[in-house]
Amino acid sequence: MEPLYEEILTQGGTIVKPYYWLSLSLGCTNCPYHIRTGEEARVPYTEFHQTFGFPWSTYPQTKHLTFYELRSSSKNLIQKGLASNCTGSHNHPEAMLFEKNGYLDAVIFHNSNIRHIILYSNNSPCNEAKHCCISKMYNFLMNYPEVTLSVFFSQLYHTEKQFPTSAWNRKALQSLASLWPQVTLSPICGGLWHAILEKFVSNISGSTVPQPFIAGRILADRYNTYEINSIIAAKPYFTDGLLSRQKENQNREAWAAFEKHPLGSAAPAQRQPTRGQDPRTPAVLMLVSNRDLPPIHVGSTPQKPRTVVRHLNMLQLSSFKVKDVKKPPSGRPVEEVEVMKESARSQKANKKNRSQWKKQTLVIKPRICRLLER
């Protein structure tokens, strides 16, 4: 394999100079060392903020920056580094890393333990004629089928309809995503921002990492998630909880304006939060499977149980009709009982005839229930 670069060892890592850059470009501040490894891959926080749009939302810029990690099959880190674009020769970082007989090709050739390549880019890879980044990445993966590639980005590059190359870039992203599970494409969001800061930004530790997320950054991450899913025709199987219900209701108007205008067109100094709204909206990343979500009713609104109140009219006594009490109701038997009642004159009769009992028949009629007719 013919080497196409020169790697120079430094105290913190290495700097790489491709051989075909025979002269320095006066219009590029990174020439000729566009690839750096180890601690040389760290950048100042100001540069990271301007390039990746963190913690503010993204805004138009022309600089391309890609951090990368090379890991083994057991996920152990073998090498970390960065690649920057060249404004003089108009090369993108992905094109430098994945070109045939390029840097990653040579590194894997000398270290067969590399099984995972992870990219953290401020822009998604493109496939425009001057760069052909996705084509080089695709061919690289065809030569190394045992190597997986995970691409994380902070904004999509030239995929909107106003760009002439948008259809070409979207089609190329679909082709790259078709290599799943060897390839995954995802936006940077949630705790991944803090991990990148700790690994690739200078003078950053766990205590100094900015914890709160700005609402504009959260909205941009959500927009990137659904946009990349629509491009590669993938269904989002997880729902993120980046905003609480209360904050989400407060930011509905901002979200509507966000869809109509470019992402974060104003600089951080120009942004002024409205009164009564906290500009620092905390972000909590929650992955919830659709199977754990409550069922969603589609179509008409499900009927709620109705409460039925029955009104009862009080019955008036004047409305009752009482049947003749002398007549027993039909079907009711009359019981006749014969009893022996002592006569009032028994005392006189006893004198004459010791005792005399008179039979009297007493008819006892059962009580007649009053029949109420409505």
UniProtKB/Swiss-Prot annotation:
Q: Which family does it belong to?
A: Belongs to the cytidine and deoxycytidylate deaminase family.
Source domain of life is Eukaryota
Name of this protein: Putative C->U-editing enzyme APOBEC-4
Main EC class the enzyme belongs to:
hydrolase
User: What function does this protein fulfil?
Assistant: Putative C to U editing enzyme whose physiological substrate is not yet known.
**UniProt region (Disordered), positions on chain:** 259-280
Q: Name one GO molecular function term.
A: metal ion binding
**Has keyword Metal-binding?**
yes
Alphabetically, which GO biological process terms does the record hold?
mRNA processing
- List its EC numbers: 3.5.4.-
Natural source organism: Mus musculus (Mouse)
Lineage runs: Eukaryota, Metazoa, Chordata, Craniata, Vertebrata
Any one Pfam family match given in the protein's UniProt record, by short name:
NAD1
- Gene3D superfamilies under this entry? Cytidine Deaminase, domain 2
Summarize tissue expression: Predominantly expressed in testis.
Alphabetically ordered keywords of this record: Hydrolase, Metal-binding, mRNA processing, Zinc
Q: Which residues bind Zn(2+)?
A: H92, C126, C133
